[in-house]
Amino acid sequence: MEDYLQGCRAALQESRPLHVVLGNEACDLDSTVSALALAFYLAKTTEAEEVFVPVLNIKRSELPLRGDIVFFLQKVHIPESILIFRDEIDLHALYQAGQLTLILVDHHILSKSDTALEEAVAEVLDHRPIEPKHCPPCHVSVELVGSCATLVTERILQGAPEILDRQTAALLHGTIILDCVNMDLKIGKATPKDSKYVEKLEALFPDLPKRNDIFDSLQKAKFDVSGLTTEQMLRKDQKTIYRQGVKVAISAIYMDLEAFLQRSNLLADLHAFCQAHSYDVLVAMTIFFNTHNEPVRQLAIFCPHVALQTTICEVLERSHSPPLKLTPASSTHPNLHAYLQGNTQVSRKKLLPLLQEALSAYFDSMKIPSGQPETADVSREQVDKELDRASNSLISGLSQDEEDPPLPPTPMNSLVDECPLDQGLPKLSAEAVFEKCSQISLSQSTTASLSKK
């Protein structure tokens, strides 16, 4: 694999047609390994004059945000320097020159910025339900399994098992295990095909790491934020909502809030992050397990606009549907309110509707019609000043006894919050894995308590 990837970088220097195997924009471990392994297979089994190049669909600078990928590449001795990232190859220029053929792996819909490349797509290999209206008119291979790496493994072992080396096998093996949550039947992510090909890889390469060991190490690396800057931590697992000119970032942070608040230059970093990305509010939701292996969630609301911050805190504190059970935590930082979240079952997905409601309350208090677009003749600065002037009337307009009506949830990949059969087998985000483990932990504690009685 390593020698092949070295050759791919050399091929970029030549003016010749390329077959680009492109992973999805999330660029998680499954997408990355599937692109690398599929391109490797195609290169080894296709006529010599055709060049197959795997491309990671992110900028190189974003790789440190994906700790599991960085860790795994180091473990199997593949240098990051020989990988090809999206900002290192001009796909649109290649297409215009008639030198691009695309193979999409772990997705089947091009991003809006890449829709012009649709005619270049020759093949799709994915493991999620097809959206026919958006799928390119090409050969499409889709099967609802837990990991796309399973489908790549199947193709290699059925088509050319002799090309599979230990390095590639280790990448595929670890990826399937991480994606399928260590093949845990309680989680329900792994399918019989996932299990079948993990077993086949283990039979071919008996010295592969034990499942528990590779899962634990990859999971630890995925959640590890110790080497990240504050901005990288905030961007690692982030969602954004936007309403009437106000942008709110919601970041999942996998460490104790107290430790996060003690980071040097934190306040300056938060200000810089919000300013750089035009965020009016930053909500940090910390997630970790304590020494008793119990889930802990905490919240921090950072917002320079006093009225807006107050409204958000009011709505979250008095929420009954769902109840967050917030307890104020100490914070010496101005513009930042911190809380311990007593109800650990409220995930970020369930928090999003409450934030939407808080924005509605904010605008309603100023008599701004819901859904009214920003006026072209009023500057953003003028709007911000008017919002701040309305702070007094805002607080008096909120009823402490009024129950917050739940809004339709923002769609997210979560095996816990939605039926896994609704949209096929979903990707498990770090948030979803934490949530599922929390429920299992809570269930086990309840069962143990009842048995004692």
Curated annotation (Swiss-Prot):
InterPro entries per the UniProt record, alphabetical: DDH_dom, DHH_sf, DHHA2, DHHA2_dom_sf
The effect annotated for residue 30 to N is:
In NMIHBA; loss of function in regulation of cell proliferation and migration; loss of function in neurogenesis; impaired regulation of microtubule polymerization; increased phosphatase activity; no effect on interaction with tubulin beta
Which co-factor is required?
Mn(2+)
UniProt KW keywords: Acetylation, Cell junction, Cytoplasm, Disease variant, Hydrolase, Intellectual disability, Manganese, Metal-binding, Neurodegeneration, Nucleus, Phosphoprotein, Primary microcephaly
Query: Molecular function terms in GO for this entry?
Result: exopolyphosphatase activity; inorganic diphosphate phosphatase activity; metal ion binding; phosphatase activity; tubulin binding
User: Could you name the Gene Ontology cellular component terms for this entry?
Assistant: cytoplasm; cytosol; focal adhesion; nucleus
Q: Where is this region: Disordered?
A: 395-421
Entries under Pfam families matching the protein: DHH (PF01368), DHHA2 (PF02833)
- Signal peptide stretch: none
Record localization:
Cytoplasm; Nucleus; Cell junction, Focal adhesion
Superkingdom, natural source: Eukaryota
This protein is called what? Exopolyphosphatase PRUNE1
Name the source organism: Homo sapiens
